[in-house]
Every structure is written in C-alpha cells, then in structure tokens.
Amino acid sequence: MMVNIPVIENFLSNSCFLILFLTTVYYWLKIGFGGKSSFSFTGLTGYGSALCCLTLQLILRWVDSGHFPLSNLYESLIFLAWCLLLLYIYIEVSTKTLFLGVLTSPAILCLVAFTDFSLPTELQQSTPLVPALQSNWLVMHVTVMIASYAALLLGCFIAIAYLVLSKFFIKTTFVTAPLSSQNTVLRQESFLEEKQKTDIVFEKNDKNLKFLFFLDNLSYRTIGIGFCFLTLGILSGAIWANETWGNYWSWDPKETWAFITWLTFACYLHSRLVGGWTGSKPALVASFGFLVVWVCYLGVNLLGQGLHSYGFLNV
C-alpha cells in the first residue's frame, strides 16, 4: 500500500500547531491564575510532542526527496521552529522556570502558523536540489546557520522581554502606610502589621529584580551560543562558496547581511565583555539585532536576488 506522504505531513503540521496552541494556553492560564513559576512537566510534554511532530515531518520530507529537507523557505522554517523548540526545552529543563514558556510559546506558535498557513502551497512542495546545493556542505552550512538564527532570535526575544518587564519592575515604589498611634504611644500590633506589609513589598521587588537579572544573563548566554554558530556558519559558507563559485566572498545580499548580523552581535558581546554593559543598554542592542536577523533570514530571501535565492521564492 502506497503511503500518502503529503497527507501525513499535513496531519503532523496541523497537530504541531494545535499542540503549541494548547501549550500556550496552558502556560498563560497557569501564570494568570497564580500557578507556580517553576518547572512544568505538562508544558514540557506539549513542547516535546510538538518537537516530535516536526521531527517526523522533517524525516518524511528527507525520505521523500532523498536529501536533507532544506531546499526551500518552508523547510528552513520548519527546521528553525525545530531548533527553537529544542533550545527552549533545554533552557527550561536547565533553569527550571515556567515563566519563559509564557514569553516564548506565543512566538513559536506564530512562527509555526506562518509556516503552515501563510506560505503558498507551491512553496511547501519538496523540490530537487539545484546543482549548486548538491554538496555535503549543505547540511553543515545551512543547519548551522539556521541553528544560529534560532539561538540569536531566542536570546534577542528574551532581551526584549527584559526591556518590557523592567518598565514594570524597576519603577515599583516602596510605599507603606503611616503607622497608627494613639496618645503618641506606638502600639505594638500596628507596628508589626505595617512591618509585615513593608517586608512583603521588599520581598516581591527583590524577586522581580532577581528575575530581571536572570533574563539579562540568559539572553547574554543564548546570544553568545548563537554568535558562535553564526561564525562557524559563515566560515563554512565561505569554504563552500570557494568550492562552488571559485571565491570565498562575493558580497551578494545574503552574505552582506550575514556580515552585518555578525557585526551587530560582535558589538553586543564586546559591550558586555569589555565595556561591562548590563541591563537595558545591551538589551537595546539585542532588540536591534532581532530585526537584523529577520532581515538576514527572511528579508533578503524574499527579494529572490543573489546567489542565495535558490529554493525560496523562485520555485
């Protein structure tokens, strides 16, 4: 009996979207109703199930096409979502914090929705590799580059979350009610009551500041990992370009924006390592980098120009 791979792929993609939607609702309801912000087995189960759906989808396309599924924009977006899910699962297991799921689950859900429901059907079909892509460097270069995009985007998104949350947390004021008195004698009950209120406020703000520090540090580490992958991806791409076209660098739009992306995050890391920046300043640089990564990944490819336009919109 013939296996209808497109039907199975459609089922897997729809299942992935539904699972991510339910997982997003779960995270928001858990936080909204005052649930614990610690490790969540249910949330991770949802993410793990979505990751399995994407993994099976990539394997099916690999078997059907005979090559690693990175020949067009649709397949690269699936792999990007796969990398984001894998990286997030690792972060949540390592940090044991639930609040990151509240921030990242809607972003990953939107990416999967765009991939499944916005791209034209023609672009979602498996296509043979053009001669320039028929190389062992395809897996090495493209997978590393997309993995770098995933790490950089997630790190930048956490930095943006830091900027938004800091507006609410840092501006919190410690306001306490005046102590009650009667005949200039301070009652012990009133003093204890007001002291308890003050301690609660300070404890809450101390937790908020610690969480902001956690986000700042997590963003820094995630972007650092992404920068290493980006550097490796650019170097492997240069070697592949020399083997294919006879020169290491041709300054086509994709290469130019990859270099701009590298410079942006090199400045970010330099400001932190050498300049000692922390908090809002590097988060602003990362926010700019968030846009740069999307231009490098999607914007240039949508133009359909340059040596890197293979397999994207010119199908």
Swiss-Prot record:
Gene from which the chain derives: ccsA
Cellular compartments per GO CC: chloroplast thylakoid membrane; plasma membrane
Any one of the GO BP annotations: cytochrome complex assembly
Top-level taxon: Eukaryota
Topology relative to the membrane: Multi-pass membrane protein
Function summary: Required during biogenesis of c-type cytochromes (cytochrome c6 and cytochrome f) at the step of heme attachment.
Regions that span the bilayer: 15-35, 39-59, 73-93, 97-117, 144-164, 222-242, 257-277, 283-303
Keyword Magnesium: no
Name under which the protein is recorded: Cytochrome c biogenesis protein CcsA
Compartmental location: Plastid, Chloroplast thylakoid membrane
GO molecular function annotations of the record: heme binding
Native source organism of the sequence: Chlorella vulgaris
Keywords carried by this UniProt record: Chloroplast, Cytochrome c-type biogenesis, Membrane, Plastid, Thylakoid, Transmembrane, Transmembrane helix
A Pfam family it matches: Cytochrom_C_asm
InterPro entries: Cyt_c_assembly, Cyt_c_biogenesis_CcsA, Cyt_c_biogenesis_CcsA/CcmC
Entry's family note: Belongs to the CcmF/CycK/Ccl1/NrfE/CcsA family.
NCBIfam families associated with the record: cytochr_II_ccsB (TIGR03144)
Oligomer status and interactors: May interact with Ccs1.
